[in-house]
């Protein structure tokens, strides 16, 4: 048995020796290369066979899956007895997923419905609150109108009053600053007057060094070319020059204060004009007024006629029909002063009598003709101003002549600088020289802009003209009462005041013509 196995082994070794060890005729070094080439070829053939087998298996897998699907559909048809089940049939696990998705969708729908109901409830509450505040605003407007003595059917705009209140507060601050400045000037005048009374001589130049007060003639003599180089180098002349320099420095300081006040005034007026432009723009957008004609004319929309513009969002109580304007006698109220309380008694009484006896509609009450309660019309006080204009110009010219005649009075340098700045300040800041009586002019008649570019507050312009006349009369009373205060006699400033008054009168006339 062992011999047979040995023989078998030898025979197989001889038979497969060439495959294991390679060709015996090839050198041993090349046998390995031959074996590697054969192995590579064999592996490639095996890969090809395996790829073909994989393709066959994939094809069979697709066929089996199709058969499986067809079999499932056949089973479902047999169970349901419906030949058109087809696409409507789902597997059990797919059906469970669909049921879960449906339940989640129902929960989301319920949550959305709950949120929608809450939003609707909140919207209803907001609407009720809005209606409540609208009613409250209407009641407040009516009560305010009743307190201010206005018409029952013409409601006052609270927003306009708030805007006017801010404007008047700024004006009040400006007036308070001016009052403080005038008080300081008055203290300065009193000190100069006391020094002047305590001095022994009032006409000699030597007294100026002791009192620190120089007259206009003495200033001209000191600064003249003939005597400028011949001043003796004495302590008296040095003190005179020092007092003169101090007076000029105070004058410059007061001029700077006047310029600063004027800038603040211009800023306040600019803010006022901007607010009025914004309000008029909103009214124009809401269709309450328009500018179809020229640039200097205003056409207000008539609420009785149908408007072609956008519908107004203002409540219905604003639509008020036209009515006849009332006079002082029909209204039952005393005549309203248009000017400052500081006017002369004669002119003041005459103006009051004219207003009391006239049949012209009141300018400072709410009984004038209004096309809409939110748009106060231009008051008809321009006619009164036209009648009073020549009187104001005449008084201004008389004041100028009186000032020219009184140039011989001696004045302190402080009074010279302060009075000149005061007169220029009155000319520049006439709107704030005297407050309007009880704020009726500004509160009840907001400024109306004319045109697109030239925006001129007409009622304020008229008030400025009257207050300019009041300042002139104040100066006249001060000269008659206290001639020892040494008021400044500045002819140029007086002429400017007269010219400004005439220009204001002409401007009011032109504005009245354009509006009419």
UniProtKB/Swiss-Prot annotation:
Biased composition (Polar residues): 414-436
Domain of life of the organism encoding this protein: Eukaryota
Pfam families: CC149 (PF09789)
Biased composition annotated in UniProt, kind: Basic and acidic residues: 1-18, 321-332
InterPro entries linked: Coiled-coil_dom-contain_pr_149
Keywords per UniProt: Coiled coil
Record has Lyase as a keyword: no
Identification of the protein by name: Coiled-coil domain-containing protein 149
